[in-house]
Amino acid sequence: MFSFLKKKKKTPIFEIDSPKISLTPNTVDFISILEKFEINYTCVTNGYITFSAHVFDYAHPLMLGIHYNPLKIEFIEIFRPMEYYQQDAYDINVSFSELSEILIKKYGKPLITTSASINGYPCEQWRTTDYIVNHYIMDRFGPEEHLHINFYKS
């Protein structure tokens, strides 16, 4: 009836703590944003870049992998730097618990928690107004911890 009465949809945002960057599903110029902040990044393959950043109010830097096509960000994955996995004391269960606690501090209790969903490994999910956070362990070439940010479809 009155088009001006329609509520405008809010653009979903994922905030990176440091450097202070806001990503939306439609952010297609993030490479120029990274260059503006003089952030070293790696083009792993066409449609996938990685870089180090601080997220979730966590004191240590994590790696962000952005999977994208020319029109939008498909999803963001967050993982520890390679050096972390190469430590003799690395324990995937300890790592999972630590990141889980960080996510609980940031988002509260997970909406979904299973102790043995994928090959007996834990899985958690949070839903915000902007995106879904999936944190899980899966076994491809040995156990791997995954943390994915998926924007809601608009």
Model-derived regions, located:
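Low-complexity, intrinsically disordered Gly/Pro/Thr-rich segments
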Residues: T128-D139
